[in-house]
Amino acid sequence: MNVAVERLDSEWVDSWCKRVSAALEPLMPSFLETHVFPPGENAVALATDESHGATGALVDLTPIPSDLTTLYWVISEISLPDIENGYFIHSPATVAEHFREYGAAEVDDESPGVVFASDGGGHLFAVATSGRVWRSTTAAWFDDFEGAAVSMQEFLEQISQRIADQS
């Protein structure tokens, strides 16, 4: 099903990064009080010249969805191992490496998706050219994918909500 969605805006992503970083700051010191182990490194890594170069190489390698390009213009990667069972948005260099090794993910009847993220349970997240985000049903690259969010923005908002729920 192709549903037209508004494309991701870099200013919105920048604002989202600031909100997430601010939400993580008070959460991590209290983590040890509610868990039997210390927190991992929960961080939003902003884009650098190096990650911009890796994004350019990824664009040359595959028809990368525009929302993923926008995302990588602002961030390099995100590591949230202590939010639920963990959420990880991979760096553009890692996405390119995985694309070379595994190719595109077949997601429903849409164009193939580019895997850009995973969770701590091994599930993969792929974005199709429509901007829709898909989640693998198992911890396998070539298994079925189901809809996770209608857009990259909704996917990021879901992560924000999970952080808020954990506070």
Regions found by a protein language model. Name each.
Residues 132-140:
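Intrinsically disordered, low-complexity regulatory segments enriched in Ser/Thr/Pro
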